[in-house]
A protein has these predicted regions:
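Short linear proline/tyrosine/threonine-rich motifs used for host-factor recruitment
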Residues: 13-15, 22-24, 30
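A short, exposed loop/beta-hairpin motif centered on an aromatic-Gly-Thr core
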Residues: 27-37
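Alpha/propeptide regions of enzymes that mature by internal proteolysis
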Residues: 74-439
Length: 439
């Protein structure tokens, strides 16, 4: 028999494997997975435990006959210890019918880069998340875009020109509400640095800054963030990123739990071609006691409504990115569906909730400098757009849930907000069957 011991600060949880049975004993509650063999034993074990300790700051110690050094474990005495730095969670919950991309985040769209700067102190929980649609010069090679305001209690910047011209010409920044002027200034400054023609031989630039109010966990009046924080996030642009209480999501609260940055992607197949549609959210909405939370179709809020009550307010910003060749009219139709994904998590878009959505396609680059009177673009026929609608709804719902599942307990100047995993017994029961990770 192999024995696995999971240690945290207060308890030892024992997992045993014997013949064709995997048994979990957690807080005196027994869970049994049957009809497995030694070949898939390891996978079942890791899927359960990796998810369980992700936000628990615990350790997994293995004592048994299987060499786990090629499976995220390091040698420790006569046994092995799980190295969480080697584990990349890609999915905690399965939403909908469509397949996800490999990373299950917005970087599954080829060329998309994300950079973040997080500020976490006793007084401040704020930051900035930067999304660059492609590695090139966004001002000189703009992307087709659209926006939609579902509930306009918000201060996001740059939407007027998006709606008029149908393009985006800067990276998209996501931050706290009172930071938007500082971050917009930084976006402009970086654009001027990269494009000396701006304001001299060509026009000006339209910075895109999305915001949510992070005042629950952040002393936002101090406007602690600086332009250098944006520049640092920009310098950290990469094709993968962390989710949860990071970047622009550091101070966000969702359904009374720690919210923030969440993302998910969907694969769309049209004929022999494969495309990706992905969503990134900054979640900061929902009733304060969690009573409205719907988790993967289940009213989880009915079981965990123990927090201080307040109305559905806050905000959510949603960025939809796809490599489908959509024009700005079609993109607006797609991003309107974000509201359906959000509502499936329990929101009714209250009076004080600023719900704003931006969508862009990387398929057609619009050149800023060109002498041609006409340009050729590829556009998908409307008759094929239903798959994009479904992908948007599914990815938005999953991104919202991911923003909570990846977040941890956060202390601010006025409040302590717990991650959803505080209610780990309910949490485990709901998500265990669909845990996925990158191997």
């Amino acid at each position: 028999m192999d024995k696995i011991c999971f240690y945290n600060e207060n308890n030892i949880y024992v997992i045993k494997y014997n013949d064709d049975e995997l048994k979990f004993i957690i807080d005196d509650k027994e869970t049994v997975i049957t009809e497995i063999n030694a070949l898939n034993y390891l996978q079942n074990l890791l899927e359960y435990l990796i998810c369980y300790v992700h936000n628990k700051c615990g350790k997994i110690i293995y004592e048994g006959s299987v060499n786990l050094e090629n499976h995220h474990f390091n040698k420790l005495g006569s046994g092995f210890i799980l190295d969480l730095n080697k584990v990349k969670i890609r999915r905690f919950v399965k939403i909908g019918k469509m397949s996800t991309g490999k990373k299950n985040n917005i970087c599954d769209v080829n060329g998309v880069l994300v950079g973040q700067k997080s500020i976490k102190t006793d007084k401040y929980n704020t930051g900035v998340t930067v999304v660059k649609p492609h590695p090139g010069n966004i001002f000189k090679e703009k992307v087709v875009a659209a926006s939609h305001v579902h509930n306009g209690f918000g201060k996001s910047m740059g939407f007027v020109q998006i709606d008029e011209l149908g393009t985006i010409e800067t990276p998209i920044a996501i931050t706290g509400t009172l930071n938007i002027g500082i971050i917009a200034d930084a976006v402009i400054e970086k654009s001027l640095e990269e494009n000396p023609e701006i304001g001299i031989s060509t026009g000006t630039v339209n910075p895109i800054v999305l915001e949510c109010n992070d005042s629950t966990l952040n002393d936002s009046r101090d406007r602690y963030i600086t332009k250098d924080d944006y520049f640092e996030a920009y310098s950290n642009l990469n094709d993968d990123f962390s989710q949860g209480a990071v970047g622009g999501g550091c101070g966000m609260v969702c359904h009374g739990f720690k919210g923030g940055i969440g993302s998910s992607s969907r694969i769309i197949k049209i004929g022999d071609n494969e495309y990706t549609l992905a969503v990134l959210v900054n979640s900061n909405f929902g009733s304060g006691n969690g009573q409205d939370l719907i988790f993967n179709g289940k009213r989880l809020g009915d079981e965990i409504k123990t927090l201080q009550d307040f109305e559905d307010k806050g905000s959510i910003t949603v960025l939809v990115v796809t490599d489908l060749p959509l024009d700005n009219r079609q993109l607006k139709r797609v991003v309107k569906r974000c509201s359906m994904g959000i509502s499936r998590t329990g929101s009714f878009a209250g009076h004080g909730s600023g719900d704003v959505f931006v969508g862009l396609s990387t398929a057609n680059k619009i050149k800023h400098f060109s002498d041609d009177a006409f340009e050729n673009v590829i556009r998908m026929r409307d008759g094929y757009i239903n798959s994009a609608f479904r992908a948007c709804v599914e990815a938005t719902e999953e991104a919202v849930l991911n923003s909570m599942l990846f977040s941890e307990k956060t202390s601010g100047r006025r409040n302590v907000i717990f991650g959803l995993n505080k209610y780990y017994q309910t949490y485990i029961e709901k998500i265990t069957p669909v845990i996925e990770y990158l191997k």
